[in-house]
Amino acid sequence: MAKIVKVIGREIIDSRGNPTVEAEVHLEGGFVGLAAAPSGASTGSREALELRDGDKSRFLGKGVLKAVGAVNNEIAGAIVGKDASNQAEIDQIMIDLDGTENKSKFGANAILAVSLATAKAAAASKGLPLYAYIAELNGTPGVYSMPLPMMNIINGGEHADNNVDIQEFMIQPVGAKTLREALRIGAEVFHNLAKVLKAKGLNTAVGDEGGFAPNLGSNAEALACIKEAVEKAGYVLGKDVTLAMDCASSEFYNKENGKYEMKGEGRSFTSQEFTHYLEELCKQYPIVSIEDGQDESDWEGFAYQTKVLGDKVQLVGDDLFVTNTKILKEGIEKGIANSILIKFNQIGSLTETLAAIKMAKDAGYTAVISHRSGETEDATIADLAVGTAAGQIKTGSMSRSDRIAKYNQLIRIEEALERAGTPAPFLGLKAVKGQA
């Protein structure tokens, strides 16, 4: 038994200078797990609650002492003495103790930090790397794959202080044979994009996720700049590198008139018009994945978009599904989208995260493991991507150490599996829905 003997919560600082929750779980035998909760900027309305103190005299109201207090008191009191290797039981104890639908009593930030720290401690007690332990929890021991990175190299929307409406323009180094080669290709395109932007007299400052955040005339101009950078780096767009976008459409959807208002371009679209706008971009550029291409509440619009684009483009639900199996189940039944973005702080525990990934895969949907715009050095999502053989990961650009921490962990994992004589496959474009 991997008996929990101590649980410690603390307030640490994330990549945006805001507090977040870190938890330590100590086991008999001296094994320790340490994990921190991430934080989002553009959030789905049905996400589990991130508990903030609201005390304007501390961190502008963003303190997390209440959540930390829950870790050190109620949660610690309930799980000390329990077996850390029973992840589902530990998570359920915290969920039941919280007693709310959206984890608003203790905060998903408190529950998740303890959930992940518990898994790390249990993995250490078994002498397993975290990805291997996650594969065991997932019911797929020894089944791994290295994920195709979706690298957010131009930031807009809520992730940047610029006039670009679409939140993320991403590259996928699909021509790579390994994760390490994919990162090299991504880095080379990133550095060439800096040169392209500089030559145009555009800003090369970076946004929350490490991508550039220039003011551009249109979303198409962002794609054109990336195309030029790919070619300058010596690669072929559509063969070596494909494109993906996160529209984060809820951020520019006007609920009063039902229009998608792209202020940066000075254009307004109905739901169906916006789908056809995206369809045109897909005809002009090799865009193989679109995230949140409609407002989270516009299920009729999503159904239409899935009908129009779903057989040739991966349509990822982020704000749409919020890593929630109840919502995902309804989406699957109604034929909404064909992929889910997995952010474990949207649901608030590792067990529930694994359930969402399994439900998606069983239904023929893909699962894209994702960071949040507010991150720390915690690299658990790298192990989650490998240990569930998800096939795809979104963890930012080729700058900011909070993003690079995840890529470096993937490098370590890929190398460790190769040295053990059990290399994990890198599926490239085959991992993307509709592209196999």
From Swiss-Prot:
What note does UniProt attach to the cofactor annotation? Binds a second Mg(2+) ion via substrate during catalysis.
Locate the residues binding (2R)-2-phosphoglycerate. Answer: Q167, K343, R372, S373, K394
Q: Required cofactors, per record?
A: Mg(2+)
Pfam families with a match to the protein in the record: Enolase_C, Enolase_N
The UniProt entry, under CDD domains, shows: enolase (cd03313)
Pathway note:
Carbohydrate degradation; glycolysis; pyruvate from D-glyceraldehyde 3-phosphate: step 4/5
Q: Does the keyword Cell membrane apply?
A: no
List GO molecular-function terms, semicolon-separated.
magnesium ion binding; phosphopyruvate hydratase activity
EC numbers listed for it are: 4.2.1.11
Q: Catalyses which reaction?
A: (2R)-2-phosphoglycerate = phosphoenolpyruvate + H2O
- Residues forming the catalytic site: E209 (proton donor), K343 (proton acceptor)
Residues annotated as coiled-coil are none
Binding, Mg(2+): D246, E291, D318
Where do transmembrane segments lie in this chain? none
- What keywords sit in the KW lines? Cytoplasm, Glycolysis, Lyase, Magnesium, Metal-binding, Secreted
The listed locations are: Cytoplasm; Secreted; Cell surface
Q: What is a biological process (GO) this protein takes part in?
A: glycolytic process
Instruction: Choose one Gene Ontology CC annotation of this protein and give it.
Output: extracellular region
Instruction: Please report which protein family the annotation says this sequence is part of.
Output: Belongs to the enolase family.
Subunit relationships: Component of the RNA degradosome, a multiprotein complex involved in RNA processing and mRNA degradation.
Q: State the protein's purpose.
A: Catalyzes the reversible conversion of 2-phosphoglycerate (2-PG) into phosphoenolpyruvate (PEP). It is essential for the degradation of carbohydrates via glycolysis.
PANTHER family, alphabetized:
ENOLASE (PTHR11902:SF1)
Q: What is this protein called?
A: Enolase
Q: Which organism is it from?
A: Mannheimia succiniciproducens (strain KCTC 0769BP / MBEL55E)
Per the UniProt record, the lineage of the source organism begins with:
Bacteria, Pseudomonadati, Pseudomonadota, Gammaproteobacteria, Pasteurellales
